Amino acid sequence: GLYSMREEQIANYERAYAYVTQLDKNGISYLAYPNETPVFDYKNIKPVNKRIVAFLIKGDNIHIKGIEVIGVQVTIKGHTQSECFEVLGSNNTLENLKMHDGMAIGVYMLSGSHNLILNCDAYNNWDSVSEGAKGGNTDGFGAHLKKGSVNNIFRGCRAWFNSDDGYDLINNAEAVVLENCWAFYNGYSSDFVSRGDGNGFKIGGYAKGRKPYDDVVANYTPIPKNTVRFCLAVGNKQGGFYANHHLEGNYWHNNTAYKNRVNYDMLNCLALNPIDFGTDGPGWNHELVNNLGFAAKVRELENIDKSRCILKNNYFDLNTTVTSSDFVSLDETLLTAPRQADGSLPNTHFLKLTASSKLINAGTDIGFPFKEKAPDLGCFEFDGKH
């Protein structure tokens, strides 16, 4: 059913925030009834000069599954944001959630450990109110964790047509894992009007020198190395996979990028010292293995010092050229196909390798299952058919 939320239902006002629903009791599951999808509509909740959070998850061992959040508003003209789900607790699972057609970030994780964001979709979100309606603060998913907030994972999620980025790990003090996640058409409206930054996976960074050096050292060191594996980036306005001025390398394993402005952009800042911490330089200390890309609009790979990175079996160093004939389908409409019955990502032909592709068995073993004599390149392993 559809539930129209009202301002009198706001559970708590705290500083600049209005928290509509506050989940602070441990060990409770909030699950949609089988074959039903509760939809919570927040379009009528507009407290003046407040950042709106639909669900604040402060407790531990909470499981939320199978609901939709739509219409979350922004009411502040200056720099601000609203959020569908804000996570502060630990050992929580957010599963099969849809956050769409609003102005808010889908999932915004600030603290807590061992949280799993599983098979969630964030799409068609644009803040049309603040900062001239550029939409520069509305990501699909974000993790901006405090020290000690470890082992947090995004798995099987999709982010598309979010006005800023698909996934954003800026100002993050602990390593995060993103696996089997998709990001497409971020930085655009649903009719492809340009909005915010538009990176698919924005992995790291500390505001490129706008934070004081002492703040970075005190609150974020040792700088984390995040992991992005078996992920897909398609048609994002800027980078498909982007290191965002990070002060360390990341792990980029078995990803696929297609038709982004730049498919892989490894831009770092030069070094963590008072002089260089805000100065851009080619990426260093990244580990890129078994990655695949095709048809970047401007460049396949940029901003990388290959001599200071670990590079193994990536398409940009092969003695062969990736072509459309390597793929069963380039039909982008399959990206928004319905999820499978268990909530997992749709199993389509899109960007799956053909039986004759030279990209099959072109990878190197990184500890995950593969079908034949070696892993394939990219996020989809050839299954004997496609």
Give the positions of each predicted feature.
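N-terminal, post-signal-peptide segments of secreted/periplasmic proteins
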Residues: Y3-D24, P346-L353
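Right-handed parallel beta-helix/beta-spiral solenoid domain characteristic of secreted/periplasmic
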Residues: S4-Q9, Q22-G78
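Extracellular beta-strand/beta-solenoid scaffold signature
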Residues: Q9-V20, N44-L56, K77-E86, D101-M109, ...
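C-terminal/domain-terminus segments
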Residues: A11-A18, E174-E179, L247-N254, N260, ...
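Feature marks extracellular polysaccharide-active and adherence modules
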Residues: L31-Y33, I57-K58, K65, I70, ...
